[in-house]
A protein has these predicted regions:
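Short, basic, alpha-helical segments at the C-terminal edge of helix-turn-helix-like DNA-binding modules
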Residues: 64-71
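C-terminal peripheral helix-coil segments that are non-catalytic and often amphipathic
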Residues: 97, 138, 142-150, 164, ...
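Short hydrophobic/aromatic patch on the recognition helix
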Residues: 20, 41-52
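Base-recognition residues in the alpha-helical recognition helix of bacterial helix-turn-helix
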Residues: 25, 49-53, 65
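Short coil/turn motifs that cap or connect alpha-helices
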Residues: 30, 44, 53-55, 83, ...
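Hydrophobic alpha-helical connector segments
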Residues: 65, 76-104, 159-166
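Basic, helix-initiating cap at the start of DNA-binding domains
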Residues: 1-27, 31-40, 57-60
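Short secondary-structure transition hinges
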Residues: 100-139, 161
């Protein structure tokens, strides 16, 4: 314990968040108690409350971390290529890589987030998570508008509904491929990669102008 007291507060918080993430992955958020997190992190429950007010605060930090990572993946995908199809392909690849490296975070990104900041009953992390989420939506919006201006994507797309459907379809395909990989291989004779490529192609064809869809 003497060693811990000399460590910065941020180190303790990171240790606890990391342990909580592992516990949430194993048991689920609702089934994980502060006692479970304390035990996994190697802290007493009393010490845990020195660094976090409650479990919701820990969940809020994890949600923020997940959104930051997603932002990085999307940003990286969009700056690597100029053509609409290539940028789309890299978005898909980035999302697959994100899910494979951070499966728990991938699921968290799809969860409900707080959007009511009129009252004072919200965590600072919740506002920042919302802000980053809006920045991601803006990037996807610009991607769609750019594709429409180039004549690659349909010009009748209603942008905001298109963005949410875009996320829903891509994330659903990726999560399904992760959960049902063995079934897909056995019943369809497709590898996970081939199944994903087919699904991503269907989504792209749904928003692309037919003459220019690949």
């Amino acid at each position: 314990m003497g060693r811990r007291k000399k460590e910065p507060r941020s180190v303790h918080r990171e240790n606890i968040v990391s342990a909580a993430s592992a516990s949430f992955m194993e048991k689920g958020i609702s089934a994980t108690s502060m006692d479970d997190i304390a035990k996994a992190a190697g802290y007493s429950k009393a010490t845990l409350y020195v660094y976090f007010e409650n479990k919701e605060e820990i969940v809020g930090i994890l949600a923020l971390n997940s959104m930051k990572k997603l932002y990085d993946y999307i940003s990286s995908a969009l700056i690597q290529h100029e053509t609409t199809k290539a940028r789309y392909d890299f978005i898909c690849r980035g999302l697959v890589q994100y899910q494979e490296e951070f499966p728990f975070y991938f699921k968290m990104v799809l969860d409900k987030i707080n959007i009511d900041f009129e009252s004072k009953e919200y965590l600072p992390e919740e506002r920042e998570t919302y802000k980053i989420g809006e920045e991601i939506n803006e990037k996807i919006k610009n991607f769609l508008l750019s594709g429409m201006e180039k004549g690659d994507l349909r010009n009748d797309l209603d942008i905001m509904p298109a963005i949410f459907n875009f996320w829903g379809m891509l994330s659903g395909i990726i999560q399904l491929a992760a959960n049902k990989e063995e079934y897909i291989k056995k019943s369809m004779g497709l590898s996970k990669i081939k199944f994903l490529e087919y699904g991503f192609s269907l989504v792209y064809h749904s928003i692309a102008i037919k003459e220019k869809s690949l």
